[in-house]
Regions:
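Conserved PLP-enzyme active-site core in the AAT-like
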Residues: 2-310, 316-331, 339-354
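Ligand-binding grooves and catalytic loops that recognize ribose/phosphate and carbohydrate rings
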Residues: 335
Length: 354
């Protein structure tokens, strides 16, 4: 249930936030004169080089419009139609991409794995691979992990190492949906390479939209062989921007002075403040560990409905039926305090409808 309200900033999604100053300034600066189209411009080259510098490895970089395209096209490049993709049962590629991974891979089957708090248990990979090996069953080829997960948790470097080892054992490729990768890196306090290629990740979908950009994700192939003809996939699927500089230039602004990490750190800090405030309310139950920029809570139904009526927006269909409260790069302590004040007032009043 979503009701439009009067609050300037919301907790429904980091997609609600506007464009951060660094991305906006870089986009403005790129809007000078003419530049070659379809990615043959210096902005795209510079953004790609900055990503290579960030991960400290030569890699192939492609810019696409959104996360669904990034995930589905990169997964399609890792497998054939008779293969299967293994992911957590709550993964975005399973629950929120309208079958795009299957569509762009011409029918690759998605098989679901278990694991606590939205994270894949490496043993579940082993069980799924061993389950059937006959010609009548789609052959497992790719494992997809979400970092940070759909439940706001984060894989540690050690957990990713274990998954990477399991992938190597069974000759599986490893894909990372990193729509909130920046928040995961900020939470872990490690270098980006530690939770990507050093752990065995073949391709990362590096999110920009949820971290202060207007739109755009970067598909980063650490296994460069797998990027062969990926540019054709982008073109065929309508993801090759003719004026590519306007898709890639904001990445320059985000990466050149560390804004991508600062904004993620801020969003995480606001979520931590929100979590701490919620823990002081005995009527509120937190559902999952808060590790990145989201907090999942169980609100009494009358309170939830009255919060909607007061103009607060948040999702209540993600996870186990609880409410997801998401902080963004521009969330302030005042926003959190205002939300908590309304919540406290309704809890004291018993949330009786007016």
């Amino acid at each position: 249930m979503m009701i439009r309200g009067q609050n300037d900033r919301q907790f429904a999604s980091d997609n609600y936030a506007g464009i951060c100053p660094e991305a906006w300034a870089s986009l403005h600066n790129s809007n000078q004169g003419h530049a070659r189209g379809y990615g043959d411009d210096h902005w795209t080259a510079k953004a790609s080089d900055l990503i290579r510098d960030l991960f400290e490895i030569p890699c192939e970089v492609f810019f696409v419009f959104n996360g669904t395209a990034a995930n589905s096209l990169s997964l399609a490049s890792l497998c054939q139609s008779y293969h299967s993709i293994l992911c957590h049962e709550t993964a975005h590629v399973e629950t929120d991409e309208c079958g795009a991974p299957e569509f762009f891979s011409n029918g690759t089957k998605v098989l679901l794995l278990s694991g606590e708090n939205g994270k894949i248990d490496p043993a579940a990979i082993d069980r799924m691979v061993r389950r059937r090996t006959d010609i009548h069953y789609p052959k497992p080829r790719v494992v997809s992990v979400t970092q940070a997960t759909e439940l706001g948790t984060v894989y540690s470097a050690q957990e990713l190492d274990a998954i990477g080892e399991m992938c190597r054992r069974w000759d599986l490729r490893l894909h990372m949906d990193g729509a909130r990768f920046a928040n995961a890196v900020a939470a872990l306090g490690v270098s980006p390479k530690e939770t990507t290629w050093k752990a065995g990740v073949d391709v990362l979908c590096f999110g920009g939209s949820k971290n202060g950009m207007a739109l755009g994700e970067a598909v980063v192939f650490f296994n460069r062989e797998l990027a062969r003809e990926f540019d054709y996939r982008c073109k065929q699927s309508g993801q090759l921007a003719s004026k590519m500089r306007f898709l890639s230039a904001p990445w320059v602004g985000m990466l050149q002075d560390g804004a991508w990490l600062r904004h993620a750190q801020h969003a995480n800090a606001m979520a931590a403040h929100l979590e701490q405030s919620l823990r002081s309310l005995p009527e509120i139950k937190l559902l999952f560990p808060r590790q990145a920029n989201s907090v999942f809570v169980e609100l009494p139904a009358p309170v939830r409905d009255e919060m909607y009526k007061r103009g607060w927006m948040f999702y209540n269909f993600i996870g186990k039926g609880g409410c997801r409260l998401m902080c963004a790069w521009d969330t302030t302590e005042e926003d959190v305090n205002k939300f908590i004040a309304d919540l406290k007032e309704l809890l004291r009043a018993g949330a009786k409808p007016a």
